[in-house]
């Protein structure tokens, strides 16, 4: 199958998306938590 060809590209894309999404979610979560604690 063509899984061997698309697998590396999908893996790199998956790592890039999660590499950017995880810090973004953590950043937004920390900001919302700070504002919630201040109130």
Swiss-Prot record:
Pfam family, one: Cytochrom_B559
Source organism per UniProt: Cuscuta europaea
Residue ranges of the TM segments: 14-30
Keywords: Electron transport, Heme, Iron, Membrane, Metal-binding, Photosynthesis, Photosystem II, Plastid, Transmembrane, Transmembrane helix, Transport
Origin organism lineage: Eukaryota, Viridiplantae, Streptophyta, Embryophyta, Tracheophyta
Subcellular location per the Swiss-Prot or TrEMBL entry: Plastid membrane
Residues that coordinate or bind heme: 18
Gene this chain is encoded by: psbF
Membrane topology: Single-pass membrane protein
Stretches assigned to coiled coil: none
Cofactor binding description: With its partner (PsbE) binds heme. PSII binds additional chlorophylls, carotenoids and specific lipids.
Cofactor: heme b
UniProt cross-references to SUPFAM superfamilies, sorted A to Z: Cytochrome b559 subunits (SSF161045)
Homology family: Belongs to the PsbE/PsbF family.
Keyword Ribonucleoprotein: no
Protein task: This b-type cytochrome is tightly associated with the reaction center of photosystem II (PSII). PSII is a light-driven water:plastoquinone oxidoreductase that uses light energy to abstract electrons from H(2)O, generating O(2) and a proton gradient subsequently used for ATP formation. It consists of a core antenna complex that captures photons, and an electron transfer chain that converts photonic excitation into a charge separation.
Record note on quaternary structure: Heterodimer of an alpha subunit and a beta subunit. PSII is composed of 1 copy each of membrane proteins PsbA, PsbB, PsbC, PsbD, PsbE, PsbF, PsbH, PsbI, PsbJ, PsbK, PsbL, PsbM, PsbT, PsbX, PsbY, PsbZ, Psb30/Ycf12, at least 3 peripheral proteins of the oxygen-evolving complex and a large number of cofactors. It forms dimeric complexes.
Annotated protein name in UniProt: Cytochrome b559 subunit beta
GO terms assigned for molecular function: electron transfer activity; heme binding; iron ion binding
GO cellular component annotations of the record: photosystem II reaction center; plastid membrane; thylakoid membrane
């Amino acid at each position: 199958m063509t899984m061997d060809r698309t697998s590396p590209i999908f893996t790199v894309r998956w790592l890039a998306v999660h590499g950017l999404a995880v810090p973004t979610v953590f950043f937004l979560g920390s900001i919302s938590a700070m504002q919630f604690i201040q109130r």
